[in-house]
Amino acid sequence: MDASEKHTRFGGPSVFLTWDERYQNTWEGEVREPASFLKENISKLPKGKALDLAMGVGQNAIFLAENGYEVVGIDSSQVAVEKAKAYTEEKGVSIKTIKADLSTYTLPEKEYDVILNFYFLERGLIPKIKKALKRGGIVVFETYTMEHQKFDKPFNPNYLLQENELLLSFIDFKVIFYQEGVVESDGKKKAIASLLAEKVR
């Protein structure tokens, strides 16, 4: 799976079917390692209850569970959800999995200490993320920017961040870390924005 294609998953029922088909093929780049940005910042996160949005096969959710979190993971693909369940069993941890369309799903308010959003952009979710975090909770957010079009297949620009958009979207939070630019991973360049921010009120 090309993680960048996650941005198209809310295009309609045919997209959901395509994602189920993709997740059925393990050769489609199944990522089983947690995101580097998450691993690097795990010590900065408050303990408690965590939510992983668009979790895919659950690698980040499982990493949090292994580090003592009570974790909820949501994805639109039933196949991804089933794989996440299987991987949690392999790892000997437990996460609550939910199949849902995040463009319409209602998040409970003041419920989570940590919320993850990796390589998925649904702008309407940002206000929901803010409400779903407890005071003192932290959002961990990383996804592609417009500049990424230089390095990968054509993207729908609606699913790419504008310059400083992610930072400005959380201007009412205490920003612990923010970085935007081009990085290299596995010999490939990608343009991303990475944010760690705390809800202070």
Task: Describe every region a protein language model picked out.
Residues 2-45, 48-56:
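Conserved class I S-adenosyl-L-methionine
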Residues 70-75:
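Conserved SAM-binding motif I beta-strand of class I
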Residues 77-79:
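Conserved SAM/SAH-binding beta-strand->alpha-helix loop
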Residues 91-102:
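Conserved SAM-binding strand-loop segment of SAM-dependent methyltransferases
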Residues 107-114:
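A short acidic, Gly/Pro-enriched loop at the edge of an enzyme's catalytic core
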Residues 137-144, 148:
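Conserved beta-strand signature within the Rossmann-like core of class I S-adenosyl-L-methionine
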Residues 184-201:
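Core SAM-dependent methyltransferase catalytic element
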